[in-house]
Amino acid sequence: MLKKYQTLLLPLLAAISGLVLGAIIMFIFGYDPIWGYEELFYSAFGNIKSIGEIFRAMAPLIFTALGFAVASRAGFFNVGLSGQAYVGWVFAGWFALLNPDLPRPVLILGTVVIAMVAGGIAGAIPGILRAYLGTSEVIVTIMMNYIILYSCNYIIRDVFSENLMKNTDSTINVSANASYQTEWLRALTNNSRMNIGIFFAIIAVIVVWFLLTKTTLGFEIRSVGINPTASNYAGMSAKQTIILSMVISGALAGLGGAIQGLGTFQNVYIQSGNLDIGFNGMSVALLASNSPLGIPFAAFLFGTLSVGAPGMVRAQIPPELINVVTASIIFFIGVKYIFELFLNSKKVAKGAK
């Protein structure tokens, strides 16, 4: 019975353990953890606008988490989600700024396609290097993050035309036709920044789940991730599958970046560092055990922590401590074999009886 629910229990235990460890750390430093968590969850769920902001924060995380999950199923540890998301944001935003008067359906579809193409190309590069040269994907994707970061910053500052710029570091806002925000969602959520990106994310979850579990390509991705040599003997192309999985991974991350840019911020601006949605997306995927259907629930938790963190100030707790809670959750994901050992020992003990 425990094994049947182990996939669900382990992430749940990791999340609860992270919250408990966060509470212990707050207590050690002289803060009231109960009051802190009360304010955190009140800030996250106390009004409809905050709930809208949770769904706004979820959408890009779902996309980057799905991207990480696809690559992981192929045995590829994609640390380059931040760069892939940023390049998707920049090129989708550029297209939107250059064509402000196109019909809304054309602009939205155009930004989606361009973001996915840009992210897919960024993902293909480390995939090709891994498949044909055997390079370490971790090192390559980390370095790609910085190559893309500074290249995109250069494009914004020196390539974008002056009429697109509000100042040296930021563009003007995209037109209403290109914005992922809608009047009816703003009215529904009391002017939150919730946008159509959340609906794209739900569709993506279903598509990726179907791809990985019900298609030949999904079987090949999982097979290559388990044993590329055996997959080659079975007639599959491990190299082609690795590259294709990274293209899909990068495309998903690129669309996540576009949703962050055109849904949350409405413009394009120079970044001082890698996008948070990349590394947080990795955390979401790990918490969900790379399950497409589990990712929205993990993203909801991270969205709640993100939106509720400022409320901890009312409990006189530095909002930065929410990062400690998040890190604690990831820590317990990393040592989840302890939970597995515990659950398995229960099973063995039961069998011995």
Feature roles, as predicted:
Residues 17-35, 39-44, 75, 209-216:
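Structural signal for alpha-helical transmembrane segments and their membrane-water exit/capping regions
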Residues 247-327:
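Transmembrane alpha-helical segments in multi-pass inner-membrane proteins
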Residues 141, 145-212, 351-352:
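Transmembrane helix-bundle core of multi-pass membrane transporters
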Residues 25-29, 35, 45-99, 112, ...:
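Single transmembrane alpha-helix segments in multi-pass membrane proteins
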Residues 58-69, 84-86, 90, 120-124, ...:
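Hydrophobic alpha-helical segments embedded in the membrane of multi-pass proteins
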Residues 188-267, 292-293:
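Helix-loop-helix "hairpin" substructures at the membrane interface of multi-pass membrane proteins
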Residues 31-35, 72-89, 129-140, 220, ...:
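Short, non-helical or kinked segments that cap or interrupt transmembrane helices
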Residues 1-17, 23, 27, 226, ...:
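Cytosolic-side transmembrane-helix boundaries in multi-pass membrane proteins
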